[in-house]
Amino acid sequence: MSGRQGGKAKPLKAAKKTEKDLSEEDVEFKKKQQEEAKKIKEMAAKAGQRGPLLGGGIKKSGKK
């Protein structure tokens, strides 16, 4: 057999992330996305406090 022996093989090293040069448009776009995500999260929290919207009305029993 080859030189490799039993056991777990070492994982390959991931390349280091380099800082990207972002243009002003990219920075504005990221900021806008973060603000929208924050708004959606706040709206979801408000909706969760109220409880279910449906559930009223006449409930039918299974009997006939």
From Swiss-Prot:
Bias-annotated ranges (Basic and acidic residues): 28-44
Name of the protein this chain belongs to: Translation machinery-associated protein 7 homolog
InterPro entries recorded: TMA7
Keyword Lyase listed: no
Record has DNA damage as a keyword: no
Domain of life: Eukaryota
Family per similarity comment: Belongs to the TMA7 family.
UniProt entry keywords in alphabetical sequence: Coiled coil
Residue ranges of the region described as Disordered: 1-64
Biased composition (Gly residues): 53-64
Pfam families: TMA7 (PF09072)
Originating organism: Caenorhabditis elegans
Stretches of the chain forming a coiled coil according to its record: 21-50
